[in-house]
Amino acid sequence: MPSEFAIAADPLLGLIQIDMSGFFLEADIHAFEEARNKAHSQLRCGPNEHLTLVDIRSMQIQSQEAVAAFKCILDNPAYKSKRIAIVVSHTLARMQIQRAAVNRDVMYFSEDLLVARNWLLNGCI
């Protein structure tokens, strides 16, 4: 399954919402990073004050190279979010994103996007 992603910025909430699916190749990851950077330029909050909601329920298991590339993206201090909520469905995908997001304030949610969004915006489940 080829990769697909959608990234939307909500400047009023200081929120970046990311939906990802499929299997990511190197070119897909570069396109994702460019789109993420463009979405960040729409935010009005201060640096590193935004929130990020990521839905990877439809994402396939990724190669080790892809996991490493996503880790580099997540480790970029210029785009580091205050909090990240990640909605996952597969155990292995969850383990992969945990490796990629090891240095971040992340909460993981199984299948429930609304619970994840509530935690992100209100700080509680």
How should these model regions be labeled?
Residues 1-125:
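Amphipathic, Lys/Arg-enriched alpha-helical "gate/interface" segment within cytosolic domains
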